[in-house]
Amino acid sequence: THAGIEDLHMLLECRFFPDYIILPKTESAAHLQIVDSLIMMAGSYFRLIGIIESVVRLNAVESIADATPRLCGLMFGAADMAADIGATPAWEPLALARARIVAACAMKGLLAIDAPFFDIGDFSGLKEETLQALSFGFSAKSAIHPAQISVINAAFTPTTAEINHARAVLTENAKGVGI
């Protein structure tokens, strides 16, 4: 939007360069390319994360994922997507949208970031949904409250057994032996 471009212009003018900018309602690959050009003209380098929040944007997710090398991830906007398709923001009605985002990110080596869990006080539900996101292929989950961060981090942190297994696989791979 015009307001978003103004915000970006002010950010670039004040020479404050964050590590990331999250772009809500990422419209298309062209949308990201415009932002990329503005950042480049300012002589800055920070990464972009696009949010996929509608059926139209989901339909273009592969081209959005390929828009610019500055893009490091795509985030799923579950609430807006649910509203767009007339569904509840539960896991099942949005599984296809999540799968498309995860696949597009995997194809391009991007972070796939799941939508936030909106019930701030329900840590059991947050843990369950975060583990589901992990098993679905997401590499991260957004948080809407600082109290959620430890639950999300715990779910995405590999266990000692998982680390040991990964090391064993790497050791065998270095030997040229399959497991």
Please identify what each model-predicted range represents.
Residues 1-179:
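Expand to "…catalyze enediolate/carbanion chemistry for C-C bond making/breaking, isomerization
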